[in-house]
């Protein structure tokens, strides 16, 4: 009984910190995707860099920008067989995206099946929308050997260009 109370208390106390770390990791991966070097940046600097360069945009599936929807209001649905994440509001599908001002780029969330799990990441396109600026993977359940390589720069650089 005491252990369960302590676990519940710890979970409650750490919830804000966990949410902060999830948001920080998201912002780090979006910034890394456009080539930002974050190695010397603390959390405050990362949030500041993100806020000054990245804006959230919501797109219809035809590519039109939707002005009156916040990305936080979209419900994500994961297709277990393909690993594809889809985003909905009132049963209408949208695509959350991000626009970088420096460097100019468009970033979209990506997901898909690997060998053992679904991989989640971000994919950045240069302004021409044809040239890949970068890719990052922030979540996967692949094995540490080959699967762990998706997080390494040498692997991610294979997609650039």
Segments and roles (model prediction):
Residues 1-161:
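Flexible, solvent-exposed loop/hinge segments and secondary-structure transition points
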């Amino acid at each position: 009984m005491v252990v369960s109370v302590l676990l519940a208390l710890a979970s409650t106390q750490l919830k804000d910190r966990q949410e902060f770390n999830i948001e920080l990791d998201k912002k780090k991966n979006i910034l890394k995707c456009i080539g930002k070097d974050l190695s010397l940046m603390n959390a405050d600097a990362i949030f500041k860099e993100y806020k000054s360069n990245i804006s959230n945009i919501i797109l219809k599936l035809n590519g039109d920008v939707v002005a009156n929807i916040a990305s936080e209001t979209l419900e994500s649905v994961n297709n277990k067989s393909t690993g594809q994440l889809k985003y909905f509001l009132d049963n209408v599908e949208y695509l959350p995206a991000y626009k970088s001002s420096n460097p100019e780029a468009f970033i979209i969330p990506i997901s898909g099946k690997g060998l053992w799990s679904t991989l989640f990441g971000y994919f950045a396109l240069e302004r021409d929308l044809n040239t890949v600026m970068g890719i990052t993977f922030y979540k996967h359940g692949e094995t540490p050997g080959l699967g762990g390589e998706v997080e390494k720069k040498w692997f991610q650089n294979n997609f650039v260009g």
